[in-house]
């Protein structure tokens, strides 16, 4: 049936599907959760309220994105101008302090950066939320333009094969990253449209020659694109190449190509040139980015920035397909690996296709300069490993992927296009399910499941625990234990209450804990639905360094942060659900572990002579090591640190005997005494431990590495102790 529909009707159907998906993505994502959306909102509000551009500075760049050109924000401010709302350029929503918990994992656990009230959802009783969504719908319009440009680019390169253009159009329309951009308040949406327009015009000029109208359109696309986001300027290379091509194709066309190219450049400069002049007059930097770049890069040298950029490439790959908001909403690895395999096949097919048309070469060049610009950005400003910086190259990328697949199956083009459209459409729905579940209120439960333990515990009339389930009754250090609690809210509270789950050992020390708002961040107690039971599963990770063997009591409660107290349940401050047997790992040292210090030293175990200590007393710490590739002697430091970061004991000294005298890969132990300050308050403390080289003691610490090689930090929380008088 699809083959009988005209290409234009199929294109219209894809466009309608895109709009529906973009709206769904927008409604699934609460206000301000998208990348830098709060800062883009502040920029638009600054323009609306002050009717002037914000000054360019480090502060305004960080808080308002003031280093970006103003076109998108001016349009958003204009569209929202009839709405009278209090939030201004200093608006700060209530923050979720537990946001980003194990952000790299697919889950719905504290993915929300902010706390959200019902007025942020349709039909938007909040003026701020309505302003956000009006700007998001502006982004959707720009996104639709990108989708149409993908179709146009396909028709330019393959005028006699509309199905290829439709395949590229569908691939762009249903790409979750583009859908997310087109459903968020951000200037990338405008930059993507104008950039993709510039690519299409450049390809048309290279393929069919230049006209005055094409030169004007290309100049407008480049100028408006740069006035949306400066990164679009890299596409001027593709535009210049198009004019060089038509000039070189025939000698008598040089003057003609130069004239049209100059017209294009003058229009672009007339539209966007004033922005660079303003920046230069204000900061001495035409881009207005020098101080902002320095603030982001900090003291990192170029070599470190390059290492960070290279380590961020796997992350960047995931953002090409679907990684939402600040990267915390992620899909299973298999999704990204599947697209990787499909891209390899496309590249093989593309090599066989041997595209040599002028338009194809210009499209290739547009992709190349976009990637080069992105690479330069990644090694200049950290945290820019996101494909939103090259979205304007997506139509060209999609087109070449479809061409590659077609080359492998030339006789199956109609079926191939249908499969491409269907696969990408299903992937967009699959990705939407992860976005939606990250912020959705927990589902209501009519009855407890059979494996849950019924219980009745009332927390001062705010809520009741009606059941629970523990994933295990025995665990080792480093293991994860899931604690599922079935809550029945009884009433909304005046202030948000926090849930805590503590694993308390026989010494009264909290060996592991989770703190979160109910609903894993999405069911704040101020918005609870009374008498609607829901399940919360708290993933509690027992530290690798947890002392074992031990018996851990699982205690759950509600904490009122405004009053700094727990809610009483019965006659206690928490409800004990059960106990877990924490067993020792197998190893040749006490509390076996494998803590990697820069592949130089491995901490394989430790022991304390006691874990409950009085102020002024001495604690004996024995650490067990394996010297893997020591490059010097090392200075070890052990600090007893309170919850507020204050240090109450310091035991810093060179490890003896000197490590350079140790046999390679031989196990050795070292003991040090830690004297607690006499005025140390009672409570629980963390024993922090780390290493530095003797030649630079206390200056450059050895970095702790994870199993996959990424840096964790420059010290570890070795143990928990209690101070009692």
Spell out what each predicted region is.
Residues 9, 104-122, 126, 150-174, ...:
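Transmembrane-helix signature of polytopic, membrane-embedded enzymes
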Residues 17, 166-168, 354-377:
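Transmembrane alpha-helix segments characteristic
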Residues 46-136, 296-303, 323-332:
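Interfacial juxtamembrane loops and adjacent helix segments
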Residues 155-159, 198-217, 247:
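Membrane-interface transmembrane helices that cradle and orient dolichyl/undecaprenyl
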Residues 201-207, 235-269:
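Perimembrane helix-loop-helix junctions
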Residues 214-230, 235-236, 270:
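Membrane-interface alpha helices of multi-pass inner-membrane proteins
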Residues 280-354, 460-469:
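Membrane-lumen/periplasm interface segments of multi-pass, membrane-embedded glycan/lipid transferases
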Residues 433-725:
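C-terminal luminal/periplasmic domains and tails of membrane-associated envelope-modifying transferases
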